[in-house]
Design a protein with these regions (language model features):
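PEST-like, low-complexity acidic/proline-rich intrinsically disordered segments
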Residues: 1-7
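Long, intrinsically disordered low-complexity tandem-repeat segments
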Residues: 48-85
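Short Cys/His-rich zinc-binding micro-motifs
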Residues: 8-19
């Protein structure tokens, strides 16, 4: 199938030819980065070095992380590929979970609020609409009670509405007006009834990992790095991808009955890499309300309990970082073969020194 210009049609979702995104049978896919940094000093304040302690049992066991099964957050059948170039120093050897911090971002608005405001729901699906309102914060519910659609819409997009979202305006406004009026088309349910029936459980929006959908003909890694840079304010040179590890996948069925896939690459940042909301970053101002580095226990608490797959992804990342060691190539060869060579790449190896097609943690 071709387009009007004579060029073959291209899907921005699966990156294949022959169909457009709206016709794609693959899950709606986003790409992102799970960045980590390591606080300097070992458990007793000593610097982490390559030695027997680095190769000992993982300090973070199944009791701390829950069941070993990853559920739908999978590493794939062969999670670790043969080594490719990597540039992470010895500061990542012998990690214990209390020294690892993961970068999380907090959305400006909840997914439920954004989906409602964009009209991404069926007016005749009260169960789904109710689920959207139950995801909203108390502040968002108050906004819906207080302001009209025009004011809410402009605030949602930070008064920077692109052509893409202007096309959604009429549809979203039409559904909003139907709910305000109630009547036969909405089964008698009104906007007011949905607001009053919401559980009002949340005071802040969701936390998660930087991610987003790729642009036309953009590679997966390029998309992940771009979204990471836009949403964190960090330059792409400030994070180093662990390239011999396949991305972690979060697969789930949304309340709208659409399949979603979030694919995350693991990346290392220096221990002194700091983050904050940049008032000059238009993407952060529009989409992000907070950002920070968090140890495992605090990070898992910030992810909402119903986001089971996202929690499993976080568990998977910590299992990898506590079970495997990232070694410069010369140290890796010394460990596994007794010989050292110049210019060899960094390797991700398990704590028993296994190399090659090492499988990820189960």
């Amino acid at each position: 199938m071709g387009s009007g210009s004579g060029q073959p049609t291209h899907c921005s979702n699966c990156n294949k030819l022959g169909h457009y995104f709206r016709e794609c049978k693959e899950p709606v896919t986003s790409y992102g980065i799970i960045a980590y940094r390591v606080k300097p000093g070992g458990p007793n304040g000593a610097s982490a070095t390559l030695g027997s302690a680095a190769l000992g049992p993982a300090a973070l066991g199944s009791a701390a992380l829950g069941p070993a099964t990853l559920g739908s957050a999978t590493l794939g059948s062969a999670a670790l590929e043969p080594a490719v170039l990597n540039n992470i120093g010895l500061t990542t050897c012998g990690l214990i979970h209390t020294n690892i911090e993961i970068l999380l971002i907090q959305r400006k608005d909840t997914l439920g609020y954004v989906e409602f405001m964009r009209g991404k729901y069926n007016i005749n699906s009260p169960e789904y609409i109710t689920s959207l309102f139950n995801q909203m914060t108390v502040d968002e519910l108050t906004r819906l009670e207080t302001f009209d659609f025009e004011a809410l819409w402009n605030t949602l997009w930070n008064n920077q509405i692109s052509r893409q979202y202007k096309q959604e305006y009429d549809t979203a406004l039409g559904k909003y007006n139907l709910l305000v009026a109630g009547g036969e088309e909405t089964g008698g349910r009104t906007l007011e009834s949905y607001i009053k029936g919401a559980n009002r459980e949340w005071t802040t929006p969701e936390w998660g990992f930087p991610k987003g959908r790729r642009g036309n003909r953009e590679s997966e890694i390029s998309c992940a790095v771009r979204e990471f840079s836009e949403e964190t304010g960090l330059d792409e040179t400030q994070c180093i991808l662990v390239k011999n590890l396949l991305p972690l996948e979060e697969n789930f069925l949304g309340g709208n009955r659409i399949q979603y896939r979030h694919r995350y690459y693991l990346a290392y940042c220096q221990h002194n890499t700091e983050v904050c909301i940049d008032s000059h970053n238009s993407v952060m101002n529009r989409e992000i309300s907070d950002i920070g580095w968090f140890p495992y226990e605090e990070a898992i608490k910030r992810i909402r309990p119903y986001n089971v797959e996202k929690r499993q992804i976080l568990m998977s990342a910590f299992r990898i970082l506590t079970k495997y060691i990232v070694l410069p190539g010369r140290e890796y060869l010394k460990l596994t073969s007794g010989h050292s060579r110049r210019g060899t790449p960094h390797q991700l190896v398990d704590r028993d020194g296994n190399r090659g097609h090492t499988r990820g943690p189960r």
